[in-house]
Amino acid sequence: MHMSEIMEMLIRRGFLWQSFEIYGGMAGFIDYAPLGNNLRRKIENIWRKYFVINERAAEIDTPTIGIEEVFIASGHATSFTDVAIECENCGRVYRADHYVKEKLGIEVDETVEAVKEVMEVYDLKCECGGRFKDPAPMNLMFSTTIGPGKGKKGYLRPETAQGMFVDFKRLANFFREKLPFGVAQIGRAYRNEISPRQGVIRLREFNQAELEFFVHPGEKKHPHFSLYAKDVVKLVDKFDSQHEITLEEAVEKGIIANQILAYFIGKTRRFLLEIGIKDEKLRFRQHKDVERAHYATDCWDAEVLTSYGWIEVVGIADRTNYDLKRHSKFSGEDLSVFVPYEEPVKVKRRKIVPILSKLGPEFRQKAKKVAEALEALNVEADLDEVEVEVDGEKVKVTKEFFEIQEVEEEVTGEKVIPHVIEPSFGLDRITYSVLEHAFDKDVVDGEERRVLRLKRWVSPIEVAVLPLLSREPFESKGMEIVQMLREEGIFTDYDDSGSIGRRYRRFDEIGTPFCVTVDHQTFEDETVTIRDRDTTAQVRVKLGELPSILKELLRSEKDITEFGEVFRQV
């Protein structure tokens, strides 16, 4: 099976189209055609079932444009880069590690130094024969201006996550500061890829589904881990060692850093299998230290084997509290939560007691804020002076303005900045992978048949109603059945063009699991046939029972033979 054969079918049948096609198109952009859009929406809704409803998470929707301060704080303004190489002759720009792998067949670390060394050793040249300039980092964010004139600098978001971190104070209040809690978002993100060459695999505008699961830094166990603990998963660790092991064992042996990461690996695997990813073509690979994102301490990718090779479709990262700490520092807001102890405890501590009679004359209108900043400090030893921050300004305070006392206090809890475990899903790659894994060919009645063996619950068109003959009363009866099924919430299409066999093949190719045929017997006894896409078997059922039978079939993997005797295969 070649990717060009699959893409030809997806374009021709209305799953994916090239964006801006009448103007020649542009790499890195695709349009979801009617069938592809419906498929992706169904995948999104199953994702919601797993990661919003079952996790009791809150789903929010934040702007796709962010102000510059957000991305300075997050680190994207300086760290969200790929190494690029530009040809001195033709001016083409390539992503360095991809170009090296394509031309030399070797992996190279994504650093300027490593790329430069490979270029020199192998005398790497452009496809036009020209020489490259020295490699340089390129930021992948799209910049924009917010407002008229010079306006305010902003960026198209490179991930949905930052909107959830920026809203953390409100979200913590929404959850009454009770950890753990999850926040989800589905939406568009943007990355100005240097040289996107892999169709739907590397896009400049793409769809993400992300969950930020906020936890106590010292409590990385999940109360429902037992649901997935015995699941056997295929793992490739950061040393390239392969394991086929239960998640429980992987945590015990230290292969996976903590139970919550393992829990979401298990949940992700179940989700991918439910939407149609094949288990034998699914693995989880741990990031090597050199490739791990700047914010992560551990990260596992769900990778799917396709005609492009192994591609990452999900990243599951322990981001610690990097993001919240950064946004707290740059915004000046307290992004901690108060975690109460089961029982109050008494602790001795050294505290700074400001001498207010001296602070006033010295610091005047700032005296109150200086005093509050002093009282908030934790001290371990006697100090001659301390430095506090007041209104963004560093202020030095010598020991004549304060005393250090040892006090015993009753403490009812502690303030912590939560850690976050993040499963991040690339919906476009997932949608394409589902389609490729479903693509199949077989022989029926001596002819080759193309069929998308999609899971019934993700098929963009669930049922097709086909009149045996393209004339009355078959057509009007067919449309009557279509209306009945649509009112029951079943995605139903109607087709009376061409032979019945040709129509079956058309719906097989787009993955429609069931075809309902109106034939001569329909008018004799109010029955119709249901044809199964995968087996081509047909059974006859009563028209009045059709909606309930189809609903039961569409939400399960039941065989149609449970509802009638097979009398024909075509």
From Swiss-Prot:
Alphabetical list of InterPro entries matching this protein: aa-tRNA-synt_IIb (IPR002314), aa-tRNA-synth_II (IPR006195), aa-tRNA-synth_II/BPL/LPL (IPR045864), Anticodon-bd (IPR004154), Anticodon-bd_dom_sf (IPR036621), Gly-tRNA_synthase/POLG2 (IPR027031), Gly_tRNA_ligase_arc (IPR022960), GlyRS-like_core (IPR033731)
Keywords: Aminoacyl-tRNA synthetase, ATP-binding, Cytoplasm, Ligase, Nucleotide-binding, Protein biosynthesis
Highest taxon above the source species: Archaea
Protein name: Glycine--tRNA ligase
CC annotations in GO: cytoplasm
Its job: Catalyzes the attachment of glycine to tRNA(Gly).
Gene Ontology biological process terms, A to Z: glycyl-tRNA aminoacylation
Stretches assigned to coiled coil: none
Amino-acid positions noted as binding ATP in the UniProt annotation, renumbered to this chain: 191-193, 201-206, 312-313, 426-429
Catalytic activity: tRNA(Gly) + glycine + ATP = glycyl-tRNA(Gly) + AMP + diphosphate
Subcellular location, principal: cytoplasm
Pfam families: HGTP_anticodon, tRNA-synt_2b
GO molecular function terms noted in the UniProt entry: ATP binding; glycine-tRNA ligase activity; protein dimerization activity
CDD domains in UniProt: GlyRS-like_core (cd00774), GlyRS_anticodon (cd00858)
The keyword Nucleotide-binding appears for this protein: yes
Record: residues binding substrate: R95, E159, F206, N207, Q208, A209, E210, E422, P423, S424, F425, G426
Designated gene of the protein: glyS
Family: Belongs to the class-II aminoacyl-tRNA synthetase family.
EC number(s) reported in the record: 6.1.1.14
Protein location: Cytoplasm
